[in-house]
């Protein structure tokens, strides 16, 4: 009975994870992107770190879009966001299911590209990503808790990843996000100067979290963000 129950639990977990992976495709397929000004090399594993809401997930979406543009089928791209409440009970032992399901979906023996968002939510994740990197999978991860933000993360990952700190928008990125795409280094007209000054005033007043651009009540958003930022760094 114990073995039967264990097998049923395994199947249920596998089916749930597969559904989550399918559901989450919509997240990166339907999100508009502002190309960030970070240089990313091909065939390098990245660990994107930074406080919440700086756009770490969007760095992954940007990479996925580039892979798609390079002709990589979406079936060979695996994205999992571990903030999903359906993954609360997931353990490090379950992580290999991601590979199994990815290979099943791709219907090929070619190693899929892995994007694991906020993976620090899974205890023991470090050994999994090191093993997968050693197996020559292309894998990118994000994290925002105190351990991921500390200098320890490089040694934790054993030199297998390039650690990249992600920050809120630069002012030039902020202008692009606000549909101001002229070369404002050569601003001449009075109206252009006024437009840039207006955006700069908002930039220094409210900051440049990517999500903030579309928010009307920026102050309320920032107050909520401060709560979210402090929570993971205490863990």
Labelled PLM ranges:
Residues 25-41:
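Pre-Walker A adenine-sensing motif
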Residues 56:
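Conserved lysine of the Walker
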Residues 147-162, 178:
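Short regulatory helix/loop adjacent to the ATP-binding pocket of P-loop NTPases
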Residues 2-25, 176-230, 234-235:
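Interdomain hinge/linker elements that couple catalytic modules in large macromolecular machines
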Residues 138-144, 165:
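Structural recognition of the conserved hydrophobic beta-strand(s) that form the central parallel beta-sheet
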Residues 48:
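Hydrophobic anchor at the beta1->P-loop junction of P-loop NTPases
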Residues 80-109:
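Short glycine-rich substrate-engagement loop in P-loop NTPases that contacts/grips substrate
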Residues 59:
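Hydrophobic positions on the alpha1 helix immediately C-terminal to the Walker A/P-loop
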């Amino acid at each position: 009975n114990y073995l039967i129950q264990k097998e049923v639990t395994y199947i249920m977990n596998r089916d749930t994870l597969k559904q989550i992976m399918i559901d989450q495709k919509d997240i990166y397929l339907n999100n508009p992107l502002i190309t960030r000004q970070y240089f990313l090399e091909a065939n390098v594993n990245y660990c994107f770190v930074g406080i919440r809401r700086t756009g770490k997930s969007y760095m992954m979406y940007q990479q996925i879009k580039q892979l798609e543009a390079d002709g990589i089928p979406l079936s060979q791209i695996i994205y999992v966001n571990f903030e999903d409440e359906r993954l609360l009970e997931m353990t490090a032992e379950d992580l290999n299911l991601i590979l199994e399901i990815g290979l099943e979906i791709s219907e090929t023996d070619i190693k899929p590209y892995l994007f694991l968002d906020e993976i620090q939510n899974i205890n023991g994740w470090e050994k999994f990503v090191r093993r997968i990197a050693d197996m020559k999978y292309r894998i990118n991860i994000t994290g925002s808790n105190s351990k991921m933000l500390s200098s320890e993360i490089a040694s934790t990952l054993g030199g297998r990843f390039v650690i990249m700190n992600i920050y809120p928008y630069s002012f030039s990125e902020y202008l692009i996000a606000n549909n101001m795409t002229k070369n404002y280094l050569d601003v001449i007209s009075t109206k252009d100067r006024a437009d840039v000054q207006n955006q700069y005033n908002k930039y220094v007043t409210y900051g440049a979290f990517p999500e903030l651009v579309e928010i009307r009540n920026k102050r309320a958003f920032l107050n909520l963000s401060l709560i979210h930022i402090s929570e993971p760094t205490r863990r």
